[in-house]
């Protein structure tokens, strides 16, 4: 019987099947149960409180957008989760320059390599209106290439932006609409008040063109519409015992869009390290506010 956890020098190996529960749908669900590993609400992974890089079979296809893997790959396809502490990712510097980097590697089962993997999920319900939660992902992990394609849509409060967020960058989950009057969010989990209509799609590709040479091309699209309402009422007791009430009612319609594309060329072997990146990021947002019957419109675009 395989051990649940094995450690050798700076490498810790977790047996996925030993931690997997019947209700676990994606590998992120299992990671949350592994000692020392934490998964934040936005999908960022920490090991002993430190951020990690994530690789699949030792290859870095996704960079900081690793939630595309952890929120889509079934634990049935992963044999072990490996934690590599003090990991020197530049092979030419290995043994010469120390590193405090931690890498989390998803080691695939042999049966999941070189075959096309497909996962589909969906739900449809009716309350005051129709609601949906539909998603699909296709994957291929071979010796010379890796590919993940995803498409998702929902209007049940599940925030798809986290999956497309670069976890190595400062969080952009809450935008600063400084020029717009915004409804005050309640002190609840976001999914409880996030009245959304969201769509996302990604394509992620890595190709090995030689020893230690990889080309990565990733692209993604995200769009969401969010409805918010708040009402505050403050009462003041005046000296003549009369009551003065001040009411503030704010309604928002928030539309956001994001389109990105990344291309990376990397040579990483015992003698040479070269990395070249090209990135494109387009973002747009439009906030329509109604404050006590007065309309405001705030729009921004960036490239």
List each model region and its residues.
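Membrane-proximal, glycine/serine-rich, low-complexity loop/turn segments characteristic
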Residues: 2-286
